[in-house]
Amino acid sequence: MLLRIAYCDDEIENGKKIRDYINQLMIQIEVEFELDFYVSGTVLLENVKKQNDYYDMVLLDMEMPDMNGIEIAEKIRELVSREVLITFLTSYPEYMQQSFRV
């Protein structure tokens, strides 16, 4: 089974670190995966609209210029007809409660 993952973070250096970590982890646990990296929530949502039900997991940064991770997650929930695992990556504790309602 192929695990399809989207990761969205406007900070490219953070994105590279997380991408490298995911690559190492998936190889270590022997899971076949595909990882797409986005620097814009708008671009991620455009691709989700085009390819409904494509991603199994979405990793979102909370603070981005075009929209925050909560807004992106809410739109993904509206667009995708099946359950997608959404995980937020942030150092802002004030977003913790908000993330549970998505």
Where are these regions (language model features)?
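A generic structural motif
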Residues: M26-L35, R82-V84
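Cofactor-binding loop segments of dinucleotide-utilizing enzymes, especially the Rossmann-like FAD-
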Residues: D10, S40, S91
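Conserved acidic segment of CheY-like receiver
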Residues: L3-N23, V58
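Conserved SAM-binding loop
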Residues: Y7, F37, F88-L89
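Acidic, metal-coordinating helix/loop segments flanking the phosphotransfer/catalytic sites
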Residues: R19, F37-M57
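A general structural signal for stabilizing positions within well-ordered secondary structure
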Residues: I27-I29, K49, E78
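CheY-like receiver
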Residues: E46, Y54-V102
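Short, well-ordered amphipathic alpha-helices
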Residues: G15-L25, L44-L45, I72-R77
